[in-house]
Each structure stands twice: as structure tokens, then as C-alpha cells.
Amino acid sequence: MASPSLPGSDCSQIIDHSHVPEFEVATWIKITLILVYLIIFVMGLLGNSATIRVTQVLQKKGYLQKEVTDHMVSLACSDILVFLIGMPMEFYSIIWNPLTTSSYTLSCKLHTFLFEACSYATLLHVLTLSFERYIAICHPFRYKAVSGPCQVKLLIGFVWVTSALVALPLLFAMGTEYPLVNVPSHRGLTCNRSSTRHHEQPETSNMSICTNLSSRWTVFQSSIFGAFVVYLVVLLSVAFMCWNMMQVLMKSQKGSLAGGTRPPQLRKSESEESRTARRQTIIFLRLIVVTLAVCWMPNQIRRIMAAAKPKHDWTRSYFRAYMILLPFSETFFYLSSVINPLLYTVSSQQFRRVFVQVLCCRLSLQHANHEKRLRVHAHSTTDSARFVQRPLLFASRRQSSARRTEKIFLSTFQSEAEPQSKSQSLSLESLEPNSGAKPANSAAENGFQEHEV
């Protein structure tokens, strides 16, 4: 009969009422987190607010499509809401003063629901934005079906509705409660089921925390595990799409398409600007996957630990690991909302230049057609000057060749074109359904390119 000894050995390591005050972290951790959270809060609000302004400027100046602008603005708004809703309340109720009374149940429910919804809105925005770029790069003939204004609005609406549905169970499962209350439907350790050590709460009134309610344990578990499945699906889907986009970009850079032989008009040598745009896009794609994995995974692990078994069954080592992971997971999670503007600036020299101009309140960006008008005027002046020296046949051939030359790149993020840059051949962007109807200045000239990640 070895089984009776197991509960006794387990119960000797189980936390009890004396461990409840340890849900409040040490003072030096609080002070450190104040400084870290303050820096992250300012950087997050400033960076995402500037991102909204930058995308609006780039769209107005003809450097960025409206559909991509809508995706990026909605993503930045969800990040801002994560900071405004999540960080102040979470720092106060979880880090600074976690022990409270049961009168804060409503605020606990609302905060948890809104924070969860905004967090998963950010996650799903990364998915839809990656999907839109995946179709544009890997399946250009189908791009028009997902790139229209109505389709983009539907995708953004899908993101927010799905995020609210993912967070909805927490509205019922969360509240303020003494953390060691037994879960009625949970088959825990024998000592906890037979003993009254967890049934009797201390007489102190401020020993409740914002946590899952014992009467809604099954709902809480289903919500956390379901949200984790959503995270894994998004992570694997984004990784799959980014890997395929990188393959297409690298193969096109080497002179061959993924599905067959490259068309004759795509075999010409490409400029250094186009190759740089591809390298920047590949770096951007890799950083997206790394950010989702590194910044979100610690917080997901902590949530899984909270849902794996009720707190009255936690061992001391389990409880200690949870409390150590808590500040790190929260910090990395908020960093994920700060990184998005940094990814844009890293992968685009044009975005970085306008971003600095917005922060300095000194916008000097010209319209995308400005440089082209100057080049067209310069070419027409040169052609007029040389017309008297060359036969008409050569002049007409030169003008016809100039009209056929386009500058189209693969990356959404595009650097400014130089007047003396060599003419480039068509890329995968020319295969996009709506590219043929657009003038060269919208997709070919300065600024953000058609294929953004």
C-alpha cells in the first residue's frame, strides 16, 4: 500500500495560508519594474502613435497602399490599447498591490476581458497582415481577391470579433477571491480534499487577489487552453507563410521562380536597390517569427501553469517558479507591442526617415510623383536637345524603350529612387492582378513597395 504515502509526501510541499502573502513580489522587484514598465509604456505609446502618423503620411504621399495602411493602423491601435488598458491596472493589481478585497470583482473582470481581447487582436493582426503579404508574393494572381477595401475591412473586423470571442470566457471565469479556495469539481490531492486547511480562510479581509474563480474552474481552463491553441495556430501559420515568402524572394533574387522557369522579361539584371529591398524583407519576415515566439511564449507558459492545476495544489517549487516567471513574462509580453514600430524602421529606410521626421515634427517628404516629374522633365529636355543631332528613327526607339521600362520591387518597404538609377526589369509584382492598371509611379517609384510583410 504505497499509494497512501504519496499524498502525505506531496502535501508536505503544498503551499498553505502562510504562502499567500508571497503573491506580492519583493519591494526591489517592484521598483525595478516601475522603471522598466515606465520606459516600455512611453516607448510603446510614442512608437505606435508615430507609426499611425507615418503610415497616414506615406499613404497621402503615394508611398503606401490604403489597404496596407488600414492593417498597420489597426495593429498600432491594438498595441496602444494593450498599454493603456493592461499596463497600469496590471502593474497595480498584480505586481504592486495584488492583495485586495472582493469588492474589486467587476474591475477585475473588465480589465481581464479587455486586456485579453486587445492582446489577441494584436496577435491576429500579425496573422492577417502576413496573410495579405503572403498572397501578394506567393500567389499574385489571387491578390486582388483579398486586397480590396471591402476585403480588408472584413479581415480587420474578423480580427476584433475573434479577439473578443477568445476573451469572452474570462469575463465569467475571473474575479477576486482568496487564492487557496478548493475547486469543487477538481480531483486534487487527497489531503486537500479531506482536510479543512484550505476551506478556512484567514480573518484578514484584504487577502483576495484577482484570479480565476473556483466555481468557474472548468471555464477558466477551457479559455486558457483554447487561447493557447489560437496562439500556436497563429505562430505556425505565420512561420509557414514567412518561410514560403522568403523562399520566393530568395529564388527570385537568384533569377528563378519557385514554380518554373522565369519569363524572359524577368531575366535581366536587377539593381542594388531591388536586392537590398529583398534582403530587408527577408530580415523583416524572420524578425516577425522570432518576436512571436520569444515575446509571447513566456507569458503563455505562465498562463498554462495557472490553468494546469488549482493554486491549492501548487507545491512550493511550483509556486516559486510561477512568481519568478511572472515579471519576466509580463515584460517580454509588453515588449512585443513595442517591437512592431522598430521592425518597420529596421526593414525600411524610407519608413525610418519619415518616422524621425514625425518625431521631430518636421515633415519634408515629397510626393511619390515629384521625383518622376523631375526625371521626365530632365529626359524630355535632353531628348529635345539631342533631337537635332540624331535621326528621328533613333529618337523614337529611345522614347519607346523608356516607356516600356518600369521599376517594380518585391518589398513593401522601399527606399527612395535615385534619378540616375539604372532601369530595372519586372519582378513578381508585375504578376499582381491590379498592377497592370496602375501607373509606374504608384508601385514602381519611391517609398513602400507593394509586397509588405
From Swiss-Prot:
Which Pfam family, any one of them, does this sequence belong to?
7tm_1
Locate the region Disordered: 255-274, 415-453
Q: Which residues cross the membrane?
A: 35-55, 70-89, 110-131, 152-172, 218-242, 284-305, 324-344
- Classify the source by domain of life: Eukaryota
Give the signal peptide range. Answer: none
Question: Where are the disulfide bridges?
Answer: 11-191, 108-210
Result when mutating residue 313 to A:
Induces very high constitutive activity and eliminates Zn(2+)-induced activation
Molecular function, one GO term: G protein-coupled receptor activity
Q: Which residues carry this modification: Phosphoserine?
A: 396
Its record classes its membrane topology as: Multi-pass membrane protein
Gene Ontology cellular component terms for the protein in this record: plasma membrane
Q: Name one GO biological process term.
A: G protein-coupled receptor signaling pathway
Tissue expression pattern: Expressed in many tissues, including the stomach, intestine and hypothalamus.
Q: Which residues lie on this side of the membrane: Cytoplasmic?
A: 56-69, 132-151, 243-283, 345-453
Family membership noted in the UniProt record:
Belongs to the G-protein coupled receptor 1 family.
* Quaternary context: Interacts with HTR1A. Interacts with GALR1.
Q: What is this protein called?
A: G-protein coupled receptor 39
Q: Which organism is it from?
A: Homo sapiens (Human)
Name of the gene: GPR39
